[in-house]
From Swiss-Prot:
It is found in: Cytoplasm. This is Peptidyl-tRNA hydrolase. Pfam families: PTH2. The lineage of its organism: Archaea, Nanobdellota, Candidatus Nanoarchaeia, Nanoarchaeales, Nanoarchaeaceae. It comes from Nanoarchaeum equitans (strain Kin4-M). The natural substrate for this enzyme may be peptidyl-tRNAs which drop off the ribosome during protein synthesis. NCBIfam families: arch_pth2, PRK04322.1.
Amino acid sequence: MVKQVIVCRKLDIGKGKLCAQVAHASLDAALKVYRNNKELFDRWYREGAKKVVLKVNSLEELLDIAKKAMEKGIVVSIIRDAGKTQVSPGTIICIALGPDEDEKIDQITGNLKLY
């Protein structure tokens, strides 16, 4: 069981802001799974709540991954910034997939590199 957060490298934002957005994505996706499939959430949590942060080079690639995950029934959380500090309102910063089965998520993200 794994949850993956994928970040678009192209954005010019500070490390602290990036960390906060990754945390938002991770929490949002976990809560979605908790509400809709508590058994899956509980198993992921019991197994150590594994999380991995990966990177892509473009917004298009990020959105393509989100679309493929949704088509496979994987929970997706898309994080848009409020735009109060470093980026324009609504800028997509990252997405989170899962938690779900490793094999299911790896079919979509297995070629991505760690952030």
